[in-house]
Amino acid sequence: MYCIQCEQTLHTATGTGCRFARGDCGKTAAISDQQDALVAALLAVSSHADAARKVGLIDAEVDAFVPQALFATLTNVNFDPERLAGYIRKAQELRNRLQLALAGKPLALPALADADWPFAAAQQAEAGKIVALNRDAARIGEDVLGLRLLCLYGLKGIAAYMEHARVLGQTDTQVAAGFHAHMAYLASEPTDAKGLFAEALAIGTLNFRVMEMLDAGATGTFGDPQPTPVNRRPVAGKAILVSGHDLHDLLRILEQTAGRGINVYTHGEMLPAHGYPAFHAHPHLIGNYGSAWQNQQAEFAAFPGAIVMTSNCLIDPRTGAYQDRIFTRSIVGWPGVRHIEGEDFAEVIACAEALPGFAATEAPVTQLTGFGRNALMTAAPAVIERVKVGKIRHFYLIGGCDGARAERAYYADLARMLPQDTVVLTLGCGKFRLDGIDFGAVDGLPRLLDVGQCNDAYAAIRLALALAEAFDCGVNDLPLTLVLSWFEQKAIVILLTLLALGVKDIRVGPTAPGFLTPNLIATLNAQFGLRLISTPEETMAETLSA
């Protein structure tokens, strides 16, 4: 086992990364190795898909499958060996189909593309060891390995967003072509550091287009988000909790529970769903329960209803003994947990009806969400005017992925200390760090603006570009500071997107990605001013000194 893809990866005297019997996320060494085997199989498929495009062959099934299956290898997504084995078998089938289609064509493919490892289910962990991500670290050096992993984890993040967009009807053959080309590049086992660095930024550029697609899919399907108060307290009655990121699944659950006397709650990054007009038509979408993903074992154990995980992040449900009332969807999996194929949630509804639900209604406590792209752009003229007259001095984007490290208290501490002439934008499950802080308003404008899910960084980027145009300056000249919390691979690709757009002086934390060596961190600092978080006091002194 060698896994170093998330923020909570182990740091020991013998090295960085989860390398023993079990990762810190809970996946076993066998599952980790099986996921590495799946990654290798997908790199092989993409290598053939990239070659096929060069001779005019496009396989739509391949274009959909590879990102979806790669999504299954993200942190806290799929721990089910049978499901992973199925993805590997399918990858082999598609690779073989493309091989036949390309037979006789004079194409140069990397050795990985045509390799035949023992991918029978019982041997996949062994195959994973053959293709372990650090298998040639001694030969290529830690810097090149780190850059390869930066590209791979960026591709994992973009794969997740491509799948989210596909579910909402958004596909693009040019995006698929770019994705396969990047995968094929990695399959060639590159060793040129400059080339790898450029590739990482190109992945970030491609992701900007994918975030645009996802934004179009969400707003085209559900309408433009509107500022909406969300109840954060239970209401008496039967209950279903929907976690993850998939708005499509949430809508189907609401449609199928209408008139059944079941209240539906969002959890984690599903909270921004309340801002979309399409969900306002369902009054039994009653509120948001709980907070960020890392608290789910206690929160799910206390929830008296059925639970649906539509995407990451899933933690071992056995700890809270709720494995018999949690269901997985799409690419999510856990051994022994019931998986919902298709869009029929009858089993979930029956489970909720058999459970007690909440006995009493608590006094409401609300949180405002819904400051998506359109809402921000609509407010932009008023924001610009407040900046010009000195009522708003600085903007802070404080958000991203949350996690369990104590150092993450920095984000809430910084938000509390910021003066009243500053505005805070937040997104992702990092928003829950700011719970309980009374931000008030600046001349009628709320000081805290929840932009949405992690992928809604697109809306924040669009606002920054609009402000830069209005003030006739570059984005880096704006009174704007990005303070990002990262945890997994979606955050990595968003960071790459920001860097590809030329955004500088980003602060990230709570720790540096384990796959980035000191040399790579120094390079990112020199070229982009990228730095780790320090203390709230230092951040304020550095950003408000002018």
Curated annotation (Swiss-Prot):
Optimum pH i 9.3. [4Fe-4S] cluster binds at C3, C6, C18, C25. Binds 1 [4Fe-4S] cluster. The modification Cysteine persulfide is found at C401. One of its GO terms (molecular function) is peroxidase activity. InterPro entries: HCP/CODH, Hydroxylam_reduct, Prismane-like_a/b-sand, Prismane-like_sf, Prismane_a-bundle. Coiled coil: none annotated. Keywords: 4Fe-4S, Cytoplasm, Iron, Iron-sulfur, Metal-binding, NAD, Oxidoreductase. It is found in: Cytoplasm. CDD domains: HCP (cd01914). It is an enzyme of class 1 (oxidoreductase). Its cofactor is [4Fe-4S] cluster; hybrid [4Fe-2O-2S] cluster. GO terms for cellular component: cytoplasm. One of its GO terms (biological process) is response to hydrogen peroxide. Disruption phenotype: Cells lacking this gene are unable to grow with hydroxylamine as the sole nitrogen source. Optimum temperature is 40 degrees Celsius. Its EC number is 1.7.99.1. Belongs to the HCP family. This is Hydroxylamine reductase. The lineage of its organism: Bacteria, Pseudomonadati, Pseudomonadota, Alphaproteobacteria, Rhodobacterales.
